[in-house]
């Protein structure tokens, strides 16, 4: 069957039988993707080829795993739900290039897994791909970005509201603390919007697939990343307040000191966090540290 014909079959290769044994676990936030158009949009948007090692997060019953295995050099699928492990191994056995690992993506030593597979199979690129549980989307993305992985990109399905905030440009009304964190480490592009009926069971919200291409160097140069991100989080902690007031949540700074730092950074005290671009937050963090 051609890729195009696969895309036209909503349930092809999904592995989902609503009356079968592999029922989604509500406690794990499982909603299985069953829409072939969305599945192949993820595969194509990830730019997977035979020189690619794919790390798949939360493969479930393998709806995305099998198309990835067709296109990639190797797929390492990391699944938390023990019920899925053996059926997925059986389902992907014939591809000969899929390894299924039982583990928590927030706990596994991902860099070691990547290093081992790159060395053993001589692959050139690393793509992380996943349909992320809504309730831990941000922790997963931030772990992947902060760990210093050798991955080239992350392509992830997530709740549309979260995805729209991540994809927003820093310094715009839709931006939030997560916007700056993700854009600091990567460039972000939207692959496809996915409606709720594309899942089993259907969630209460729509989804979006984003691709985050990891930067070789950070978007801005900062002396202290941890403090830089603290400033951003403080700025957005009470996002309707002005920076002069919201930055008081940093602790340890008098209002006069914050005013002086804002002046030194060339930022008006009555501006809100959402109006600052990345460079302005970097200047502000440096000014506060020097205050």
Protein language model features and the residues they cover:
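Short, flexible active-site recognition loops that position polar ligands and cofactors
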Residues: 269-275
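Catalytic cores of RNA-modifying enzymes
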Residues: 1-230, 263, 274, 283, ...
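An accessory alpha-helical subdomain
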Residues: 208, 212-214, 220-257, 265-268, ...
